[in-house]
Regions:
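Stable alpha-helical elements in mature extracytoplasmic
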Residues: 26-30, 55, 123, 127
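Structured C-terminal subdomain patch of bacterial secreted/periplasmic proteins
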Residues: 62-135
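Short helices/loops that flank or line small-molecule/ion binding pockets
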Residues: 54-63
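Second-shell loop/turn segments in exported
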Residues: 15-18, 46-49, 110-117
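Basic- and aromatic-lined ligand-binding clefts that recognize polyanionic substrates
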Residues: 1-40
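Short, flexible loop segments at the rims of nucleotide/cofactor-binding pockets, characterized by
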Residues: 43-48, 81
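Histidine- and/or cysteine-centered catalytic micro-motif in compact active-site loops
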Residues: 8-12, 44-46, 72-74
Length: 135
């Protein structure tokens, strides 16, 4: 589809934006190979870092029509409650995808503990569920 997709990981201590690049981490490389387009803020030519750690004020770079977010990962940051504070923050509420109601939480185990074929299929399932328009 002709949309930009933003993706962010919310942990108990920071934000992480895994960049779209030829050297992207597993699930984000699958997005790239599936033709999912990311906004300019979330792209890299592969020569620099593969990850940004923006402050709350810098989240305005997440200009995607659709926003996927991951809470935590291998740690127990889901229980910190920080993501609930972030989702209620006016800066988050101003993001285009949030305003449009196109925000989807995806499973941290699938996206951050990526472990091969099963995880790859789950990422593809998430793409189909959240990005590909229905009939």
């Amino acid at each position: 589809p002709d949309v930009d997709v933003s993706i962010i990981r919310i942990t108990g201590w920071d934000f992480q934006v895994y960049l779209d690049s030829p050297k992207a981490y597993g699930p984000f490389l699958i997005l790239r190979e599936a033709g999912v387009r990311r906004p300019p803020y979330e792209r890299s030519d592969g020569s620099g870092p593969r990850l940004k750690r923006p402050d709350l004020e810098d989240l305005s770079g997440l200009t995607g029509d659709i926003l996927l977010y991951i809470v935590g990962g291998a740690n127990d940051s889901d229980t910190s409650g920080r993501h609930e504070e972030v989702l209620a923050n006016p800066l988050w509420q101003m993001l285009p995808a949030v305003k449009a109601g196109n925000v989807h939480r995806v499973d941290a185990a699938t996206w951050m503990e990526f472990s091969g074929t099963t995880s790859a299929h789950r990422v593809l399932d998430d793409i189909e569920r959240t990005i590909v328009p229905g009939p």
